[in-house]
């Protein structure tokens, strides 16, 4: 959490 990911936006987790 708190990670910048292009896939999940700014979540960093794929749920």
UniProtKB/Swiss-Prot annotation:
It comes from Vitis vinifera (Grape). Binds 1 heme b (iron(II)-protoporphyrin IX) group per subunit. Its cofactor is heme b; Ca(2+). Belongs to the peroxidase family. Classical plant (class III) peroxidase subfamily. GO terms for biological process: hydrogen peroxide catabolic process. GO terms for cellular component: extracellular region. Its EC number is 1.11.1.7. This is Peroxidase 6. Keywords: Calcium, Heme, Hydrogen peroxide, Iron, Metal-binding, Oxidoreductase, Peroxidase, Secreted. It catalyses: 2 a phenolic donor + H2O2 = 2 a phenolic radical donor + 2 H2O. The keyword DNA repair does not apply. GO terms for molecular function: lactoperoxidase activity; metal ion binding. It is found in: Secreted. The keyword Heme applies. Removal of H(2)O(2), oxidation of toxic reductants, biosynthesis and degradation of lignin, suberization, auxin catabolism, response to environmental stresses such as wounding, pathogen attack and oxidative stress. These functions might be dependent on each isozyme/isoform in each plant tissue.
